[in-house]
Amino acid sequence: YGGYRYDGRWRPIAERLAAHFGLTNGDRVLDVGCGKGFLLYELIQVVPGIEVRGLDISEYAVQNAKPEIQKNLEVGHANHLPFADKSFDLIISINTLHNLYCYDLEKAFKELERVGKKKYICVESYRNEKEKVNLLYWQLTCEIFCTPLEWQWWFEKMGYTGDHEFIYFE
């Protein structure tokens, strides 16, 4: 996270998420694996009056978050979300869940379902050996390397009801 600086790249993603999920004033959004909170910062710019929270395993990321959003972030793990059942209108987790071990991934899916009304996750995946090699070289913290079909198996096994996307390293 040391070289990860705010550059505005999350604005278009925040706009698409807000439009797709119909986010409005008063909605509550949780970002699991929020890093320094840049996406959450953009969400409060795009949807005034939205309430955002972020959770990240990195104490460094939370301590060095964008000042305008830092008070909304806390250190924690995806396998234990310290929030009440269905307390968020939307849970986002982008490029995070593949960093968990299988036993933590199972708990994380259950927690996402428990805490969120709507959910959106994006995970790294591969469709061929070239993409797998690229993923192996790029992702230093990845613990789970799954094809889209294998991720689909996880989604079904865990009863995941939210939206999902894959990112590939072509």
Residue spans for each PLM region:
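A conserved beta-strand element that flanks and buttresses the S-adenosyl-L-methionine
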Residues: I92
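Class I (Rossmann-like) S-adenosyl-L-methionine-dependent methyltransferase catalytic domain
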Residues: Y1-F21, N25-V32, K36-P82, L100-K107, ...
